UniProtKB/Swiss-Prot annotation:
InterPro entries associated with the record: Cuticle_assoc_protein (IPR053031), Znf_BED (IPR003656), Znf_C2H2_sf (IPR036236)
Organism annotation: Caenorhabditis elegans
SUPFAM superfamilies: beta-beta-alpha zinc fingers
Protein's UniProt name: Protein dumpy-20
Keywords from the named record: Metal-binding, Repeat, Zinc, Zinc-finger
First and last residues of each zinc finger (BED-type): 137-186, 350-399
Gene Ontology MF terms in the entry: sequence-specific double-stranded DNA binding; zinc ion binding
Region (Disordered): 96-119
Binding site for Zn(2+) 2: C369, C372, H387, H392
GO annotation (BP), single: regulation of transcription by RNA polymerase II
Example of a GO cellular component annotation carried by this entry: nucleus
Known role: May be directly or indirectly involved in cuticle function.
UniProt xrefs under Pfam families: zf-BED
Length: 440
């Protein structure tokens, strides 16, 4: 028999599932047709047709006597060979992709010739790609100083230190801490790269002329004062709806009507304002000497605009008045000198609470009890009174009475204390003390 029959192809494909000794007993040589006449199975020549299984699949008519067998039904008889392996994601320890048939993959067929019975599970050659995290190139120049170990680690080429969480920020910080000169180079290169990148992108979207500088004439001081043409006459009725008052002094508008020709038209409103109001309104408002820089600057500008006045005498009078006022203000303010020997004191006033008679300050900012040498932190009268109330009841009662008596003298009718009154043992004593020092 030339070539390979379809039975041999099926048996070779399922050679791992079916033992070899059962082939002759399972496959018969003759089959009975519908009329009860047995006829031999025709042996087709498959040597010249490699797609025999796909073009002439076996069906239920061919294997009517063996439909009860689970291994030779029509479902498993039709061979569908996939073109791509589905288990190529596994890698071996040496970094080479392994064959999926070695891992027990379900895709045991291959893309080789089905008609050949030599091998039906030949895997293609694996292609190893470099470990690239992103498709775009790295634009930061700091990558030139580092060698990538994996997706999370890089090694510095200068000091061979490993930097985790490989990104441009961490690598730039490493250069900044350990390689200052190279860090300056990297920052300069990065700025230059970004400037060039921005220039290229702007040229792509906008047309930039070769000479971008404007040749329009620039008027000096045009942005300081608006351009105003000199007015020939000033008529208030043009701007305000008012009636003419016969009692109004018309001499106030003479200088508005005839401005000086020597004055620059651009600065004419400002100079006109100074000439009319500098000596009348501002000097009357600044009759008293001013110690602020604003007042002195206004006075200087007023004298500059009116040089005909007696500048020297007026300026001397202002300076003398300023000196007198400054001396008076300094004398009125009490001069406070910070103590240098006791830096822990927060206030310069004397402690008025009588509880301080039982405590003294320590060098660390706390206080020490004179009776029991106990240290009280955060020294204040409330903490001292609580210490006496817990540990020295007799002294606490005395201090409390002294404090109430002193408060009655300085602040009559007002008793502000965060410490409770003493608990007297004798009821009669408590009554007498309560009648003597009644708290309203």
């Amino acid at each position: 028999m030339e070539g390979h029959s379809n039975t041999s192809v099926i048996l070779h494909t399922y050679q791992q599932q079916q033992p070899q000794q059962l082939i002759s007993s399972i496959i018969p040589q003759t089959l009975s047709d519908g009329y009860g006449i047995s006829a031999p199975i025709s042996q087709a020549d498959c040597s010249g047709n490699s797609n025999f299984v796909n073009t002439n699949p076996w069906n239920n008519t061919t294997f009517q006597a063996y439909q009860t067998d689970a291994q030779f039904t029509n479902e498993i008889s039709v061979l569908n060979y996939p073109n791509v392996y589905d288990d190529f994601s596994k890698e071996s320890s040496n970094g080479i992709l392994s064959d999926p048939s070695l891992h027990g993959s379900n895709s045991s067929s291959s893309t080789s010739d089905v008609g050949s019975s030599v091998d039906c599970s030949i895997s293609p050659e694996p292609i190893l790609m470099p470990s690239v995290k992103r498709g775009r190139p790295t634009e930061n120049p700091c990558w030139a100083y580092f060698h990538r170990i994996d997706d999370q680690l890089v090694k510095c080429r200068l000091c061979t230190k490993v930097v985790r969480s490989a990104c441009a920020t961490n690598m730039t910080k490493h250069l900044e801490r350990h390689h200052a000169d190279d860090y300056q180079k990297v920052t300069g290169q990065l700025k230059l790269f970004r400037m060039n990148d921005v220039g290229i992108r702007s040229k792509m979207h906008y047309e930039v002329a070769d000479n971008p500088l404007s040749t329009l004439p620039v008027v000096t001081n045009s942005y300081i004062l608006p351009k105003m043409e000199p007015m020939d006459t000033f008529d208030p009725s043009q701007y305000y709806g008012m009636q003419q008052d016969p009692t109004l002094n018309q001499q106030q508008f003479i200088q508005f009507e005839q401005p000086q020709a020597s004055i620059d038209p651009q600065t004419w409103p400002l100079t006109h304002f100074w000439q009319n109001t500098a000596q009348t309104n501002i000097m009357s408002h600044l009759g008293e000497a001013s110690t602020s820089t604003l007042g002195s600057s206004v006075i200087q500008e007023a004298h500059k605009m009116n040089p005909d006045s007696n500048d020297k005498s007026f300026q001397l009078d202002l300076e003398q008045q300023n000196c007198v006022i400054i001396e008076q203000k300094l004398d009125d303010k009490p001069r406070v000198t910070k103590p240098t020997t006791k830096p822990y004191q927060k206030r310069n006033r004397k402690t008025e609470h009588p509880v301080w008679a039982f405590f003294k300050r320590t060098g660390d900012g706390n206080a020490e009890c004179i009776i029991c040498q106990g240290v009280v932190k955060s020294p204040c009268s409330s903490n001292f009174m609580r210490h006496l109330m817990r540990h020295h009841s007799t002294e606490y009662n005395d201090v409390y009475l002294k404090w109430i008596e002193k408060r009655n003298i300085t602040h009559p009718g007002i008793h502000c204390t965060s410490v409770p009154p003493p608990a007297f043992i004798n009821n009669e004593t408590s009554r007498t003390e309560q009648t003597t020092f009644s708290v309203k």
